[in-house]
Each structure stands twice: as structure tokens, then as C-alpha cells.
Amino acid sequence: MSSSVEQKKGPTRQRKCGFCKSNRDKECGQLLISENQKVAAHHKCMLFSSALVSSHSDNESLGGFSIEDVQKEIKRGTKLMCSLCHCPGATIGCDVKTCHRTYHYHCALHDKAQIREKPSQGIYMVYCRKHKKTAHNSEADLEESFNEHELEPSSPKSKKKSRKGRPRKTNFKGLSEDTRSTSSHGTDEMESSSYRDRSPHRSSPSDTRPKCGFCHVGEEENEARGKLHIFNAKKAAAHYKCMLFSSGTVQLTTTSRAEFGDFDIKTVLQEIKRGKRMKCTLCSQPGATIGCEIKACVKTYHYHCGVQDKAKYIENMSRGIYKLYCKNHSGNDERDEEDEERESKSRGKVEIDQQQLTQQQLNGN
């Protein structure tokens, strides 16, 4: 899936999201802008919009969504008023079918709506504050399944109605017939879909193949991210590069190779678990266990997101060095290489001196 997304910078800093018409990046996620500068939208505003489905084509995309689909959803939103601020652009509806509440993403937060986000399962749902209690039981069921089987391919049993993103009805009160027609069209599209595939990391809702515990995609990305290694005993899977650059994984020596991509399986599982709390600097999704090598830097990435964000990867197999420097610190790698070279020479000299001293002691005895 090609990506034409670029970070907002320079003259584009004043651009506003086509949905919420704001610059609330802290609440709504990164503001993504198309290459032609004509479309801008917050990542969260797109992820939770009712009629947006992830794009799997090679055409231009915005945060994993088709530019054309984003434009259609923005246009649909011009006729949908927010239940909290009463402004247009409210394409995020309560997931209870009979509820007519619709929001902007930040308005849903301010109105204390319940946000359900499970990227590895492609689930992005909102329940208004009135229906929080209704959603509680299904949330508990989902959480249990997510904790136990996050890395396990979805089975037909797991695709119960309560775990799907359901189509939302919008508030048609006071809208023209044309508006009702447009809004209903968006709802009809959702009803024809068996699953709301919102995650740009997912390939297909019917795809039951193993997915990487870090980047949440499967073997289709092997060429760019390395072989997908599968550990059936723990229902775990991970791409080689995702493990190689992950901060906490331990690569085994040549004399003790494991069957899980030459990595200590325990450290891989620990990293996957840690990754659930680590959101990517670029895409805001969990699983970002690759951190910038500069200690003071807080940027973390998925392997492919680091590449996309022009971070610099240092890979020296002979010396076992695998590092990432974000684009702001990419100039520091040369200095680190020099320091490591000096340290390596110093260690080598100490070892030689120790060997000579030991030999002299043996000869003296």
C-alpha cells in the first residue's frame, strides 16, 4: 500500500482537519496531509469515521485510507451536526444502532463517550455516555479475547455481532431530503460491510493468516520487513526486521540458534507485550518498540514507519549493531560509530594485555 502522507511542517502547519476543522493534534492524532496539499485530516478522525474503510490498493492514500474515500466522508460530514458542539463534520456515530448521537473525535472525548480501540483486530468504536453501560459487557468479552488471543488469527467464533463495528444511524432531524439521502447512503454502505476494517495495518477482514505482533500485518510484507516467523506454541508471529531493531529483543549466538528467527522467544514475547503500550510516532498505533538511539528522544516506531519517516537505520551484522536514529538525530550515528570503534579497540588492547600478563605469570611459575 503506497503512502502519500507527509507530516505537517513549514507552510502546511496552519492546515486544519477536514472533519473537526481544528489543529487538535494532541487529542485527534497526527494531522495527515495529501501530497497535493488538498486533503488534510487527523488520523483519529479518520479511524473512527463511520463510512471509512482501510484502502488496500496501490493508489494514493492518506494514513491507510483512500484519498477519494476520505474526500467523500468529509463531504458527507458537512451535513452531519455534532451532538456536542452542533458544528458540521461529525462523522463519528455511537455504535448502538438506535442511537442518533454523532461527534467529532475530540467532542466525543469531551462528552465522556467510551472509546474502544483494538488496532490489531481493526476495531474502532464509540459509545456515547448514555450507552456506556450497554457497551460494558461486550467490552469485557472483547478485552478477555484480546488479552488471550491477540496474536491468534481471528476465528469464525470470534466474529460475533457484538465485536463488529456496526453501522451508525445519524440524526436526521431538521435535515433536508437531500441530506437524508446522503447520510443514508453512508449508512447503507456500512450495512453492506461485514466488518469495519479501520486499521491501516490490516489486510482483509476475512484474512485469518498469522500477523506480526509488532506491525500487525502478515507475510505480504516479508520483502520489506523480513521473513514472518511463527511460533505456534505461543500463538506469536513477528517479522525478522521488526524483531531485529526492537529495543528489548535478544539475538541468540550461532551456537544456540532458536527456531524463532534466531531470537530468544521470551524476549520477543516480552517486547510484543510491551509494544501494546508503545504508540508509534508516525501512525499512532501500538507495537512501536523501535526507539531512537538518543536517550533523551522519545520517538518510537514500527520498522516500516521508521523507514517512511526517514529515520536512519544502522545495521552492522558483524558487530551485532542494530540501531535507529530518528530524522532529527540521524547525524549522531557517525559519532556513535567512532565511539564504539574506540571502545572496541580499547577492549581488544585490554584483552591482549591480560593475556600477556597471564602468560608471564605462567612462565614465572
From Swiss-Prot:
Compositional bias of kind Basic residues: 157-171
Chain positions of motif Nuclear localization signal: 13-16, 129-133
Zinc fingers (C2HC pre-PHD-type) by residue: 14-52, 209-249
Listed result of changing C45Y: In BFLS; Loss of interaction with UBTF
Subcellular location, record wording: Nucleus; Nucleus, Nucleolus; Chromosome, Centromere, Kinetochore
GO BP term, pick one: blastocyst hatching
Protein name, UniProt field: PHD finger protein 6
